[in-house]
Amino acid sequence: MEQKFKKGKDHGVGVLTSGGDSQGMNAAVRSVVRETIRQGHRCYLIREGYNGLINGNIELAKWAHVANVTHLGGSMIGTSRCDEFRTTDGRKKAAAIMFDKRIFHLIVIGGDGSLMGAQKLKEEWGRFGEELFAEGKITEEVANEGRELHLAGIVGSIDNDCIESDKSIGSDTALHRICEAIDGLVMTAQSHQRVFVVEVMGRHCGYLALTAAIAVEADYVFYPEIPPDEKWPEQLCHQLGSVRKMGKRQNVIILGEGVTNSKGQRIDVRQVKEEIETRLQLEVRIATLGHLQRGGAPSFLDRLIGLRMGYEAVQEVLKGKEEKEGAVVTGQKTIAKVMCLRGHNIQRNELSRVIRQTETANEEIMQRHSDLACRLRGFGFLDKQTYLNFVSIPLSTTMPSRTKTFAVVHIGSPCAGMNAATYSFTRMANHSGIQVIGIKHGWDGLKNKDVKLLTWANVQGWAQFGGSMLGTKRQLPSEMDLIAEGLNSNNVDGLVIIGGFMAFESALILQQNRSEYTCLSIPIVVIPATISNNCPGTCMSLGVDTALNEICRQVDNISQNAIGSKNKVMIIETMGSRSGFLATMTALSTGSQFALIRQVETNEKDLEKLAIETKERLDSGNLEKFLLIRSEGASDEIYSPDVKKIFDKVMKNKYGVRITNLGYSQLGGHPSCFDRQMGIRMGVRAFEGIVNPVKMGDRDCCVIGLRGSSLRYVPVQGLGKKVCFEHGVPHNMWWLDLHPLVEAMTKKPQEAVLSS
């Protein structure tokens, strides 16, 4: 069978995965293949990394080759480390194969070593072409056609050591595996009052070690960027002794695999174990997680990043010699780019510069230049060290008798991350000599004086729990006299409201009543926490990541069962109220064929047409199953049973149609690593604003907004003009730009048909 493409000049695009495998690579490969075919070009799967490029292990990709791969870990096309490609002769052999197959556009998915090799190939490409032509191995026509190699890189590495990118493919899933493992270890450690020393991967980058330490409330962490001095055993044992005196029954110590002390001497898990046993006489166990960190299904975030980076990489390599606008050109040669994640945006940065900066950071770490190494890693890396110091180091003094009081209340539906934010806010406040009270069960708790004193000790372990430890309620503040009395009786000097759209509305109501109640003239901060992701002022709310990981797990199971069953059409309903965020992200990350949301109008005729197309694709064998993700608030006229009736009428009992309402299971169990560490970051940021309102600017009633990679204070008053109160959503939603990718990645274009 031969694949035919639409008329016009077509290009050959090669995609390979190289180096260590990482979860999310398959999502990127799928995206590259389908977007290339959608644009009418040839896509080649280069198997086994650079070995396949040298040996000609290359296959023309078809649309169906990348069906049902998004949920799989590892690399579907194989990956390897290739010593031969490090040589000039090896790269020339690879170039000869590429000229032979007319592959002049290459997308490489891998770590810094793999991308460095790709950059070297691009630099030598012109010379290789001239030599191959002179040797008579390629014609003049082929030499002219391939005079330039269009190259794009995608960082696929669990180490997340690439400078200029917030995340690399695989790092988020690796953190999931680490947190899952340590959550399990904590239970057994607590039973026996043991200490666990956990070794994690990361090579010369401490991202995994440091981020995991924050998420699991580790007592101590070793990572390469800050090598400890020779007195580290005393410091470690003092820390463990302090938390034991406060009643903690277990301890977790995380050790990055590339850690040395300030003199360059390797620190290993056995050495840490022996020091603790000798000095504290505690029972210590070692857990080396190893390749477990690379295994399992990809997380939601790695699926989404892989899809988006693959799509952007295709746009980069195919922008063509004809397109000059926006392209960076040196003479006749375009500059290779690497896809980098910044906040929720994908940027295309110069590959050679990113490689140099990554090499520089690694060299500074090897030279043990801590300050410069941490600065090169970015401000977020420095902030994490600060957060860890405050939330893990016990109080050195008792709380003063007279102090300020800050209050925390949870509003709306419970979700993951609420407790993590409360935990970090409480510990930051206690370190500053400020007491914190938790208002139980929403505003009713404040009116009924149902509050609880939160201390450094009694919030221990909260970051690892989902839901709301304080109790939450869907309600807005009413009976303002009782609200004011509750604040006055507890001498509240600052208030944190954790929740979704109702939390934002609550802050707005309190601010509007300040002229009547002086006790409301206190700093107020909203921490957005809702799986609907409809809180204004932020790109992402707490709880979203945990919910989407749970949804992906369930949809994967439903999809698998649909393949081997007569029930080929699955209508899956997600939460989200009037916001279609969950449905859109679910469709993108699970390979679903359609997302039905309020923000994109769909009527009965559209659904009838969709059902007819679906039946035709199922009949032809080009589709194994059809997944339709419907947001619960997608329409007030067409509900899931109505969608089923439309499909049933078209399918005529040939294919079964089933509805699955995921319900409250979407809220998830233990919070994901992202929600834990982001909750802790937001809790710290909330404290910084309340204790020093000048940081919040002219307004002292703000939402903590995740904008790009940073957390900012966004005034509540201004946000009131940017939302639809009727439907409880912001007017502008960044994620709507991604919605067209649902169809682009699943609907095979007519121009790319298979002929027998």
From Swiss-Prot:
Metabolic or biological pathway, per its Swiss-Prot or TrEMBL entry: Carbohydrate degradation; glycolysis; D-glyceraldehyde 3-phosphate and glycerone phosphate from D-glucose: step 3/4
Pfam families associated with the record: PFK
Biological processes per GO annotation: canonical glycolysis; fructose 1,6-bisphosphate metabolic process; fructose 6-phosphate metabolic process
Subcellular location: Cytoplasm
UniProt binding sites for beta-D-fructose 2,6-bisphosphate: 474, 530-534, 575-577, 632, 658, 664-667
GO molecular function list: 6-phosphofructokinase activity; ATP binding; fructose-6-phosphate binding; metal ion binding
Active site: 159
Annotated binding of Mg(2+), by residue: 112
Domain of life assignment: Eukaryota
Catalytic activity annotation: beta-D-fructose 6-phosphate + ATP = beta-D-fructose 1,6-bisphosphate + ADP + H(+)
Cofactor: Mg(2+)
Enzyme class per UniProt: transferase
Residues that, per the record, bind ATP: 20, 81-82, 111-114
Stretches for region C-terminal regulatory PFK domain 2: 405-756
Enzyme nomenclature, EC number: 2.7.1.11
Keywords from the UniProt entry: Allosteric enzyme, ATP-binding, Cytoplasm, Glycolysis, Kinase, Magnesium, Metal-binding, Nucleotide-binding, Transferase
Region listing for Interdomain linker, in residue ranges: 394-404
Binding positions (substrate): 157-159, 194, 201-203, 257, 285, 291-294
Record text on activity regulation: Allosterically activated by ADP, AMP, or fructose 2,6-bisphosphate, and allosterically inhibited by ATP or citrate.
Family as reported in the entry's similarity comment: Belongs to the phosphofructokinase type A (PFKA) family. ATP-dependent PFK group I subfamily. Eukaryotic two domain clade 'E' sub-subfamily.
NCBIfam families cross-referenced by the UniProt entry: 6PF1K_euk
General function of this protein: Catalyzes the phosphorylation of D-fructose 6-phosphate to fructose 1,6-bisphosphate by ATP, the first committing step of glycolysis.
Assembly description: Homotetramer.
Protein name, entry field: ATP-dependent 6-phosphofructokinase 2
